[in-house]
Amino acid sequence: MLDPRARTLLKTLIERYIADGQPVGSRTLSRYSGLELSPATIRNVMSDLEELGLVSSPHTSAGRVPTPRGYRLFVDTMLTVEAPIDAEAVARQVQNTLQAGEPQQRVVAAAASVLSNLSQFAGVVLTPRRSHVFKQIEFMRLSDKRILLIIVTPEGDVQNRMLATPRDYSPSQLTEASNYINAHFAGLSFDEVRRRLRDEIDQLRGDMTTLMHAAVTASTEVPDTEDTVLISGERNLLEVADLSSDMARLRKLFDVFDQKTGLLQLLDVSSHAQGVQIFIGGESTLVPIEEMSVVTAPYEVNGQIVGTLGVIGPTRMAYNRVIPIVDITARLLSLTLSQQ
């Protein structure tokens, strides 16, 4: 537990390091902390913070820099997040980019782009998970013994499947079957629909049962595509010296983007939490580069979390600026997708 003096000096050190990118010495801390302390006293406090693992001393400098542990304490207990001065402009840019009525994949890709543009780092979005339940089903007769099955998920995703049936069905029969399924089974998983159809088989005509079983089978055969990670603005990170100053670190950075496995795991973890999450490299095992942080937030469709978005940047990022960008974008993406 830090005393108020140590907390103030640590907060000042991290804020100055984020702003300038240079190790922070006692003279700078004396100037910006607002504390009337001698250089010797400040150096003693810095030594204590270093022993606690909150700051470290680069070999080439008398100043100190925050460690991942120091950043974690800062973002958890010292950071004051306020709406950015241009909050309305940020919201307006997000709204203008995320157009309701556009295909879901295009809206989600636009969210990654707007996160990158606003933060000047990389924007990342985990696309909505494929739903295992349905909101509505329709049958459309194409030709003899060939039917188009149209599945609408609660997220507004539309999936089409071709059915080859052993007999022909009239449009009225197809309407009857879809009305029955929608009235009795909407909102259920296809496995649950299959189970209930077995229980209700005696109450249904044989021709309707055959068609419904064919529809359920086709629905569960729709490939459950892997969660997709969309990234925008990777090149922005090439301008960040903390991430691109040596070849080994640069190689790690692009491994993150190429493989995406680690990002997928991180975004999946953050989708189970409420609100903005901050993952700090060197402190979180989910971030493979010590100099990298990821700020994430889940987004929803009609109150149900379906994915995650965020900003990838240096650990030395202005968290008080990036956090509102991520939060606003997540809220407006949720609103846009819910209006689809």
UniProtKB/Swiss-Prot annotation:
Task: Give yes or no: UniProt keyword Transcription regulation.
Answer: yes
Report the transmembrane regions from the record: none
Please give the coiled-coil regions recorded for this protein. Answer: none
Q: Does the keyword Manganese apply?
A: no
Q: One Pfam family name from the record?
A: HrcA_DNA-bdg
Superkingdom, according to UniProt? Answer: Bacteria
Q: Name one GO molecular function term.
A: DNA binding
Kindly give the PANTHER family that the UniProt entry links to this protein. Answer: HEAT-INDUCIBLE TRANSCRIPTION REPRESSOR HRCA
Concerning its family, UniProt says: Belongs to the HrcA family.
**Protein name (Swiss-Prot/TrEMBL):** Heat-inducible transcription repressor HrcA
Protein source organism: Burkholderia cenocepacia (strain HI2424)
Gene encoding the protein = hrcA
